Amino acid sequence: MELDDILDAGRGDRLFLLGNEAAVRAAIESGVGVASTYPGTPSSEIGNVLSKIAKRAGIYFEFSINEKVALEVAAAAAASGVRSFTFMKHVGLNVASDSFMSVAYTGVRAGMVVLSADDPSMFSSQNEQDNRHYARLAWVPLLEPSNPQEILEYMNHAFELSEEYRIPVLLRTTTRVSHMRGVVEAGERRAEPVKGFFRKNPEQFVPVPATARVMRRELVEKMKKLKRVADTSELNRVLNEDSESDLGIIASGGAFNYVYDALQTLGLDVPVLKLGFTYPFPAGLVAEFLSGLEGVLVVEEVDSVMEKEVLAVATSEGLDVGVHGKLDGTLPEIYEYSEDIVRRAISGLTGIKSHEKGIEAPELPERPPALCPGCPHRAMYYSVRRAASELGIEGEDLIFPTDIGCYTLGIEPPYSAADYLLSMGSSVGTACGFSAATSQRIVSFIGDSTFFHAGIPPLINAVHNRQRFVLVILDNRTTAMTGGQPHPGLPVDGMGEEAPAISIEDITRACGVEFVETVNPMNIRRSSETIRRALQHESVAVVISRYPCMLSEGAVRGRPVRVDEEKCDLCLECLNELACPAIVEEDGRVFIDPLYCRGCTICLQICPAGAIKPEGKR
């Protein structure tokens, strides 16, 4: 499907969309004037699509420097009377949470929707946090769609809700909902202003203690009203309500899809309460659903959020109903669910056995993720190891704090260059801690986009507190891991327009770093020599490793190389030190697959026997 179809579709047109693409269509239909994000899987496709069509749609869109800024951009737009949409992966809401908590107090003048894409089973994340807790923490309404059509409908509804109650609305998706495809029926596009006007009202928008106390009281009153709305919301509905089964099921979000499929497989007619408006929790509706049931299965991903609410409702209403789910072991406490998992839980409660077998897949050899052929990070890892070894710094004497990005794959051998990781930017902050607490040497790795996102404040901290470590900024000219989005270091913005590029060299020097050098990582000799001097520097040293990602438009592809079998003595240094997917050992010989080789020449530079040569040379 062409991306323009998402923009140009008329009312009633049917589109086959990813969940994330449906979110873009919803933004267009709802009249969003400002959209913002920092890219992060599983939400990345929303920004990727918006960046291509926002200009035509009349939407201002930006890839912000981080999620906190993205949320603040959206909040200011909503305060100015312009509908806004900000979206991020689940851990991104941690970064934005300071301002997120406050915008719940100040409220909005136009609709504001915050989409959190959670990642059950941590397919591309460092934790499995359940961001439904944020709705409760911030006191904002929470909607949970189950498929692309619902993403469209729920987002449209969320903007109406946001404006009626002057409050931001949190929309929670999960990896499967974000990345599933489905037929979406387009609706009307709403005309909304793309330029607003901010009318000053410090009593509403400046939460100093005196005004914040008033805002807090108003927020409590809003939530009381929203609780009544949740109880009667059309987003909450009962399926199979005429069923005579004494077991019921309550489900939300992507978990509902597993329930639906499992019941189809089992051929069971069981009442199901599908919750789409899940906070404030619709306690009245749930109490009504529970009455007359002997047991209820609560199916949700990730934490037992609804299950605890259901238990509270059953207790407060004096209902003698068994509540099953994560807490009693009927369902797993962690990771994403599947139809098999939910079907087994239902079978266990009903005694009805399924004759369906789970999908039987052949056992495959493990294939850990790897850096791409020609990746400049591989070259820099080699140079760092080599330089440290030449100075006698090895093993436990050398700590490698790392960060979020492709280079996290440095954890894999032979690089083994990832010893500590917490979050975006933590490579720099934790280097400060290791420098203060140990006498070990430290080399931290951070990417270019991550440096802009969260690496600058801890670098200032390091200089001010006289810490000593080497910071390697891996500048591959893109936000690579999430799909190649731009960042402030590039001369282009989120809508493809020319923009000022911010120099990493200038920033690091402005932070007070005296040792700042830029290298081409594909030059092993020069890179190793620079790292060697950086390790000998008595304070913070920054080495910027600059070379374009091999998957980017600016990728450099050289002439493929080959192994001269007459010279190769099978020392296997190329294999053991680089782990490049293009280098293969087979039948007692080493060869380089020309389909994979990008001509980076790193293997050529490190071969002790000089047995690797460019194609065509003898």
From Swiss-Prot:
It holds the Pfam family TPP_enzyme_C. InterPro entries: 4Fe4S_Fe-S-bd, 4Fe4S_Fe_S_CS, HACL1-like, IorA, Pyrv_Fd/Flavodoxin_OxRdtase_N, THDP-binding, TPP_enzyme_TPP-bd, Transketo_C/PFOR_II. GO terms for molecular function: 4 iron, 4 sulfur cluster binding; indolepyruvate ferredoxin oxidoreductase activity; metal ion binding; thiamine pyrophosphate binding. Residues 559-590, 588-617 form the 4Fe-4S ferredoxin-type domain. [4Fe-4S] cluster 1 binds at residues 568, 571, 574, 607. GO terms for biological process: organic acid metabolic process; sulfur compound biosynthetic process. Optimum temperature is 80 degrees Celsius. Its EC number is 1.2.7.8. Signal peptide: none annotated. It comes from the Archaea. Disulfide bonds: none annotated. It catalyses: indole-3-pyruvate + 2 oxidized [2Fe-2S]-[ferredoxin] + CoA = (indol-3-yl)acetyl-CoA + 2 reduced [2Fe-2S]-[ferredoxin] + CO2 + H(+). Optimum pH is 10.0. Binds 2 [4Fe-4S] clusters. In this family the first cluster has a non-standard and varying [4Fe-4S] binding motif CX(2)CX(2)CX(4-5)CP. [4Fe-4S] cluster 2 binds at residues 580, 597, 600, 603. Heterodimer of the IorA and IorB subunits. Catalyzes the ferredoxin-dependent oxidative decarboxylation of arylpyruvates. This is Indolepyruvate oxidoreductase subunit IorA. The lineage of its organism: Archaea, Methanobacteriati, Methanobacteriota, Methanomada group, Methanobacteria.
